């Protein structure tokens, strides 16, 4: 009986930890993460204070913080090839990182670190040098900066059969040296690395290549992490938010369901299907059942996105900044529909898969510059600074915890819906105008369309809609309009 009680206690404790790892630890009603891909720590600190906090963003996903290999031309993916766990990269050093985390936390912006637990750097001829000056010999699996040696890795093999679980979780992903997470020593080094980041005040982690690690090994690592640092405003006994990269298109040998009990999972099907819909390959009317009705994970388990730093570079259905009208429509739907833990992308311009972030002649990452409209210049795209996107972050905050209601569609690619009595969204992806009297569910009054303009000193710089006593308003979105979206909410009442 005592053994049973102990087993039950341990089981409940484990379940409690796993549930806690689904909590992003947001402030107030904020509920959108932005991925500031390849930004420098000092620039992120300023962005938290000057832009993200005033506009209601909840958190920032940052690029990997650990020392990485220096690759010719400095492609973005060198950040995903660790040399050591020293916190020195082209984004800055440990002091700059710690300063950024503190400053962002002080204004209610949480920091989530992209972490590499699966592997170290891939093959390199001779001695490789990292961004902190540490030497390593990847071909010999020698990483003195940790230190790791050959005994800490799985035997070398290629993934040639993606239906073979052993290969997927033990062989080398694109030649990257595959760590043995079942080893007590490797586990201890990974926990030490993550705990150091927790001590510095981060709120959680995006776990790269999670499907290439056994879920039971990850569970051990997560369960043995420290609680979040209360000196950064986290409650006592709060756990790190975990979201895991698991690419699962369905019928995979390693499935997302093996990981969703440990934390959230990146819902790649969301990205693919929303791209198909707004590219015109699936009628928007079908989005009424969006979410689990499409075979997606439960809402609180799904990290959702239109595109990410990987798939935005691939050919296919996924939308990116190069299709701005469709991208903004898809993002508006993403942030308005009550499904998932939302993340928006902030990119730099790229011409090919390997394009590095904007850099100077000495290969130092350069800071973004801003135009008069607040948008980014000098090679940075900064989708999060597009009015149509940051306005929808405000919309999502305004309608938090409300239900979707009053769905309307024209049987094709014009849709509209309410979020309780706090928000209304309409989208026109047809080649003809949307002109319709629709129920906005809002209290009577005049509302600023936050897509076409902003509410400044009580006046709307874009379109506005007058809502009558029954909650109805005349909605017009021309086929040739710049954005194809109209959004109203209670915090944008004129």
UniProtKB/Swiss-Prot annotation:
Cofactor: Ca(2+); chloride
InterPro entries membership: A-amylase/branching_C, A-amylase_C, Alpha_amylase, Glyco_hydro_13_cat_dom, Glyco_hydro_b, Glycoside_hydrolase_SF
MF GO annotations: alpha-amylase activity; metal ion binding
Positions of the record's site feature: Transition state stabilizer: 310
Residue pairs linked by disulfide bridges in the UniProt entry: 48-104, 157-171, 376-382, 418-441, 448-460
Location within or outside the cell: Secreted
Cofactor binding: number and manner: Binds 1 Ca(2+) ion per subunit. Binds 1 Cl(-) ion per subunit.
Range of residues in the leader sequence: 1-20
Binding site for Ca(2+): 118, 169, 178, 212
Ranges that cross the membrane: none
Enzyme class: hydrolase
Catalysed reaction equations from the record: Endohydrolysis of (1->4)-alpha-D-glucosidic linkages in polysaccharides containing three or more (1->4)-alpha-linked D-glucose units
Record's keyword terms, sorted: Calcium, Carbohydrate metabolism, Chloride, Disulfide bond, Glycosidase, Hydrolase, Metal-binding, Pyrrolidone carboxylic acid, Secreted, Signal
Residue list for modification Pyrrolidone carboxylic acid: 21
Any one Gene Ontology cellular component term annotated for this protein: extracellular region
Binding residues annotated for chloride, in chain numbering: 206, 308, 343
UniProt-annotated catalytic positions: 208 (nucleophile), 245 (proton donor)
Xref: Pfam families: Alpha-amylase, Alpha-amylase_C
Enzyme Commission number: 3.2.1.1
Oligomeric form and interacting partners: Monomer.
PANTHER family in the record: ALPHA-AMYLASE
Family that this chain belongs to: Belongs to the glycosyl hydrolase 13 family.
Protein name as annotated: Alpha-amylase-related protein
Naturally occurring in which organism (per UniProt): Drosophila auraria
